[in-house]
């Protein structure tokens, strides 16, 4: 049986990366929340 997680850095960054988050309003809200919480890494790419 094939595993469900087949890692790809490109797909990961395109969906969850910093530029993807900045591209729309809700993504920017995600970043704002993570900054407020004090996360060291805001996104997987950054």
UniProtKB/Swiss-Prot annotation:
Pfam families per the UniProt record, alphabetical? Ribosomal_L34
Q: Name one GO biological process term.
A: translation
Q: Does the keyword Ribonucleoprotein apply?
A: yes
Q: Which InterPro entries match?
A: Ribosomal_bL34, Ribosomal_bL34_CS
What PROSITE patterns does the record point to? RIBOSOMAL_L34 (PS00784)
Q: Spell out the GO cellular component terms annotated for this protein, sorted alphabetically and separated by semicolons.
A: ribonucleoprotein complex; ribosome
**Domain of life per record:** Bacteria
Q: List the disulfide bonds.
A: none
Tell me the GO molecular function terms: structural constituent of ribosome
Keywords annotated in UniProt: Ribonucleoprotein, Ribosomal protein
Similarity remark: Belongs to the bacterial ribosomal protein bL34 family.
This protein's name:
Large ribosomal subunit protein bL34
The record's gene field reads: rpmH
């Amino acid at each position: 049986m094939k595993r469900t997680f087949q890692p790809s850095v490109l797909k990961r960054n395109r969906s969850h990366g910093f530029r993807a988050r900045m591209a729309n309003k809700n993504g920017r809200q995600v970043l704002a929340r993570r900054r407020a919480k004090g996360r060291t890494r805001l996104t997987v790419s950054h």
